[in-house]
Amino acid sequence: MGKIIGIDLGTTNSCVAIMDGTQARVLENAEGDRTTPSIIAYTQDGETLVGQPAKRQAVTNPQNTLFAIKRLIGRRFQDEEVQRDVSIMPYKIIGADNGDAWLDVKGQKMAPPQISAEVLKKMKKTAEDYLGEPVTEAVITVPAYFNDAQRQATKDAGRIAGLEVKRIINEPTAAALAYGLDKEVGNRTIAVYDLGGGTFDISIIEIDEVDGEKTFEVLATNGDTHLGGEDFDTRLINYLVDEFKKDQGIDLRNDPLAMQRLKEAAEKAKIELSSAQQTDVNLPYITADATGPKHMNIKVTRAKLESLVEDLVNRSIEPLKVALQDAGLSVSDINDVILVGGQTRMPMVQKKVAEFFGKEPRKDVNPDEAVAIGAAVQGGVLTGDVKDVLLLDVTPLSLGIETMGGVMTPLITKNTTIPTKHSQVFSTAEDNQSAVTIHVLQGERKRASDNKSLGQFNLDGINPAPRGMPQIEVTFDIDADGILHVSAKDKNSGKEQKITIKASSGLNEEEIQKMVRDAEANAESDRKFEELVQTRNQGDHLLHSTRKQVEEAGDKLPADDKTAIESALNALETALKGEDKAAIEAKMQELAQVSQKLMEIAQQQHAQQQAGSAEASANNAKDDDVVDAEFEEVKDKK
């Protein structure tokens, strides 16, 4: 078996590593660097440049020099974050026919995975040059909070680059592997704070060592898939543009060439301010007007930069609290804090993280290389070169289906260890229903419409039967890459439908955070809604069973009783259409009171007919065996 290489496909920089014996080794690219800028350029003469060569020519070719493509991968063009990038990126972001965010390069439409594949090809070539043999397999890292669409798109990029992606691994988890593999750490709980070029993750990970085997178990994860160093750069660029406009009266935003020079200068200044208290942004001949050439010379202090980005740093703190809460831990339970991603070199970030955890982050983990090293370790685990390592990752949000009453019924709860598989039996809502719609949801709210829709499919060909009798088994299966597969099977007919969730749009961080915040803020209203739906379902069941008993009783039921029952049934039916739980319960009680004679007749029939008895008990027991949360009938118009 050949080597499985580990690739950190980053927003700003990428890195490749391999297992060399028992040690992971980060490889230098053709330019002699251990990291490669995730920049791709398409030149006028048709050449494709990747990495440093692409970065060097960006000033003269801004429209066709693509960077931070990871922020677009697996996203919809109409996403708020994408629209924000449309207005600030020098290259052209367009909407594809399927609604995804694509790019227009010299009149050619290109998908983000297609462009990211160029970076992966360079990583592949770097490994092949070092090993002297072809490389066909890789472990690629993604932010822990990447959703299905983004993970799928990353795998697609690997395939386009000629790589079989053996595993998608979360970046903080990879960093934990890099940190914990060669250390005698014993049993420890660590927090991995990963602030990269375009994404932010926090993972709480427990490392256990038993008889020489190390288990890396992710307890909880949280984050923001649209927060990173690029946002810090943008704040500084906007400040410099505004200062220049105040001084010279010229808005550089209308000059792509000037903006590209400014981007490079801002990134350089930001890096310098991590070690210096102030720096000069000096750009001669940045632009010109009728009076002649204009030069930029602006002094920027560390304090100024910190004031520009303070809210971005603070945005990363809230997910830390949620992750700890989900893990059931407090800050005092964390033994070590690991910083990953280039943006964590900023002193303000280090200070805020240290203040939150009450301890200094460790300095013995290289923030640029740890993720690629961890990916290589995982590759070694898959080939068998690395032994006695077990990695247990989690899914970041609950997954379930929409059931009767518009309820989200979870099959897999958030922070469940993956891979995992869970099945549950549901039934039909109406007599002789021949099809159901399986509507797959992701989120934390009780009301189905408050969650993110991942897709839906129909299961047809259900044999005619009374409501509640068919048994439909729904199975959710999340693989080790965090990708969801859903199946629905009619246990009677054996008919089955399956889908892999390949949503072209996925959850962005703000949507996820909003779901979690809404779930917390609306816990009480969610609880009341859930109780209302349960009462409605009980009332609905009572309605159907009473009508059936009236029909079976026939002439044995006195006319007065029948009239009273019909009246109570109509009153309950009206109450079920409302939102008042107490009113439904009252009407159910009234129906029970006027149905006493009916109950007596039913009991007599029960005693007299053994065959009827068996049928009745099966009918009454159905709700014990089947979850009382049912599908709406599939209408033809769907």
From Swiss-Prot:
Signal sequence range: none
Cell membrane as UniProt keyword: no
Compositionally skewed regions (Low complexity) per UniProt: 604-620
Keywords: ATP-binding, Chaperone, Nucleotide-binding, Phosphoprotein, Stress response
Modified residues (Phosphothreonine): T199
Pfam families in UniProt: HSP70
Entries under InterPro entries matching the protein: ATPase_NBD (IPR043129), Chaperone_DnaK (IPR012725), Heat_shock_70_CS (IPR018181), HSP70_C_sf (IPR029048), HSP70_peptide-bd_sf (IPR029047), Hsp_70_fam (IPR013126)
Function: Acts as a chaperone.
Full protein name: Chaperone protein DnaK
Record gene name: dnaK
